[in-house]
Regions:
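Walker A/P-loop
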Residues: 25-63
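Conserved Walker
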Residues: 11, 30, 34-38, 80-91, ...
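Conserved AAA+ ATPase "SRH/arginine-finger" region at the nucleotide-binding site
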Residues: 59-62, 164-171
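Pre-Walker A (pre-P-loop) alpha-helix and adjacent loop at the N terminus of AAA/AAA+ ATPase modules
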Residues: 3-39
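Short glycine-/polar-rich loops that comprise or flank the Walker A/P-loop
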Residues: 30-31, 54-56, 96-97, 122-124, ...
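Conserved alpha-helical scaffold flanking the Walker A/P-loop in AAA+ ATPase domains
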Residues: 22-25, 79-100
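Conserved AAA+/SF3 P-loop NTPase catalytic/coupling segment centered on the Walker-B
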Residues: 46, 66-69, 93-120, 152-160
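AAA+/P-loop NTPase substrate/partner-engagement loops
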Residues: 53-79
Length: 171
């Protein structure tokens, strides 16, 4: 990640959220982590700080992502330059072996949620579009954050998280 990281250990409180994220860092196969809480409870800060820990590679899935960004597609520059269609990997393929962070996961569009669920289930990203058919490994740990005031999470996506932590404001 290219943004400055707030150190994981510098976040005061939120011990259950920290413990869940550290469990994921140690054993990515636990099934992912969902942090749910109101705005300003350090959910995103903690997840981004996880990427600063040794051995953890973190990629972010923006809520504004498109299918091309998520799955990949034709590398337009190469297609224009050479006339050949070459595959440009999307975020899911690049997340292989990493932690994929979806902020406001409950706000992801249905098409992205379906692609994410399929890839989580199979561990493979399949792309068939624009005259390209491509398959690549995509085994990653999913971390999501959400504010319940902004909507619920689809049940089929909720089932993909092994750990759920309700994050509250420290008093």
């Amino acid at each position: 990640m290219d943004r400055p990281l707030y150190p994981f250990t510098a976040v005061v409180g939120q011990e259950r959220a920290k413990q869940a994220l550290l469990c994921l860092a140690v054993e990515p196969r636990i099934g992912g982590v969902l942090l749910c809480g109101e705005k300003g409870t350090a959910k995103s800060t903690l997840v981004r700080a996880l990427g600063g820990l040794e051995g953890v590679r973190l990629l972010e899935l923006p809520v504004s992502a498109t299918e091309d960004m998520l799955l990949g597609g034709v590398e337009l520059e190469a297609a224009v330059r050479t006339g050949c269609r070459t595959f440009q990997p999307g975020l899911l393929a690049r997340a292989d072996g990493a932690v994929l962070y979806a902020d406001e996961v409950n706000l992801l569009p249905s098409a992205l949620t379906a692609a994410l669920l399929d890839t989580l289930e199979t561990g493979v990203c399949r792309v068939e579009r624009d005259g390209i058919s491509h398959t690549c490994p995509a085994r990653f740990a999913l971390v999501g954050t959400m504010n319940p005031e902004e909507g619920t999470l689809r049940p089929q996506l909720l089932d993909r998280f092994g750990l759920y932590v309700a994050v509250t404001g420290e008093r």
